[in-house]
Swiss-Prot record:
Alphabetized PANTHER family for the sequence: FORKHEAD BOX PROTEIN G1
Presence of keyword Transcription: yes
Residue range(s) of DNA binding per entry: 119-210
GO cellular component terms, A-Z: nucleus
Source organism: Drosophila melanogaster (Fruit fly)
Entry's localization field: Nucleus
Keyword set, alphabetical order: Developmental protein, DNA-binding, Nucleus, Pair-rule protein, Transcription, Transcription regulation
Tissues and organs where the protein is expressed, per its UniProt entry: Expressed in the posterior half of each parasegment just anterior to the parasegmental boundary.
Protein name in UniProt: Fork head domain transcription factor slp1
Length: 322
């Protein structure tokens, strides 16, 4: 019994081992058959020939780019960019030459300008305003008169009646070359007149630019310095350290400099009042001096100097002429 059990055990173990082997060998082709069906996909990685073919396919230019191929592509793209830039430059130069040739050809230019009568005139709005005022018989125009002049002379303003009128109004109010004067009571109509300021005598319209230009910019500064010297010199001469002041019918009072400064700053009456009080404080102990005039009387300068100062002040626009 014991022997039979041992034989049974030994037979069972051998049979079990021998039984597993044929089962594995039998089932192995079944497991490899589906892999064999996908042999075309997995074949490059299954043998050495396949690996060589895969590496050759990877190195071929039809696959993804390598560092060498990317560098070559970037170099070729840079060369193409340079060629494009050079081509654009040559194209721009050619267009510039064509434009210059068209501008230099009078026949083409005349045809272009003749076909467009409503072209904007080559003048600034300030130049157009000055042109309108200078061409008027009385050297003055209202705002509507300026509009009418521009509409009658330039077809552009007749065809386009919006936008440019606001620009005319803004330039009239901002430019110092134009001065507004009130209309007299016996003059029928509406609106104030616009005239050219006396300081605009040296202003002209540029032929090439179409804008206002000044003949001699340094001349106005020279006249301004002479004007200031003419105002301050006679009054500052009343100082005890200076030359004797000329007699204009008024005594030499110490507030002459303050009066001149007030006159230069648009005739400020407060400066006269302060100067008058200072003069009274200084002149109180000296009874033998002439009685100083009231500030109301000082607002009118001596007759010999009044007209000249008023004309100069009006010329430089320090206060309105009215």
């Amino acid at each position: 019994m014991v022997k039979s059990e041992m034989e049974f055990k030994s037979n069972f173990s051998i049979d079990a081992i021998l039984a597993k082997k044929p089962i594995n060998t039998a089932t192995q082709p079944i497991k490899t058959e589906p892999v064999h069906h996908h042999h075309q996909y997995v074949h490059p990685y299954s043998n050495s020939d396949g690996e060589l073919s895969a590496s050759e396919d990877f190195d071929s230019p039809s696959r993804t780019s390598t560092p060498m191929s990317s560098a070559a592509e970037s170099l070729s793209s840079q060369n193409n960019d340079k060629l494009d830039v050079e081509f654009d430059d040559e194209l721009e130069d050619q267009l510039d030459e064509d434009q210059e040739s068209e501008d230099g050809n009078p026949s083409k230019k005349q045809k272009m300008t003749a076909g467009s009568d409503t072209k904007k005139p080559p003048y600034s709005y300030n130049a157009l305003i000055m042109m309108a005022i200078q061409d008027s018989p009385e050297q003055r125009l209202t705002l509507n008169g300026i509009y009418q002049y521009l509409i009658n002379r330039f077809p552009y303003f007749k065809a386009n009646k919006r936008g440019w009128q606001n620009s005319i109004r803004h330039n009239l109010s901002l430019n110092k070359c134009f001065t507004k004067i009130p209309r007299s009571y016996d003059d029928p109509g509406k609106g104030n007149y616009w005239i050219l300021d006396p300081s605009a005598e040296e202003v002209f319209i540029g032929e090439t630019t179409g804008k206002l230009r000044r003949k001699n910019p340094g001349a106005s500064r020279t006249r301004l310095a002479a004007y200031r010297q003419a105002i301050f010199s006679p009054m500052m001469a009343a100082s005890p350290y200076g030359a004797p002041a000329p007699s204009y019918g008024y005594p030499a009072v110490p507030f002459a400099a303050a009066a001149a400064a007030a006159l230069y700053q648009r005739m400020n009456p407060a400066a006269y009042q302060a100067a008058y009080q200072q003069m009274q404080y200084q002149q109180a102990p000296q009874a033998h001096h002439h009685q100083a005039p009231h500030p109301a009387q000082m607002q009118g300068y001596p007759p010999q100097l009044n007209a000249e100062l008023f004309q100069r002040m009006q010329f430089f626009g320090k206060f309105p002429s009215s």
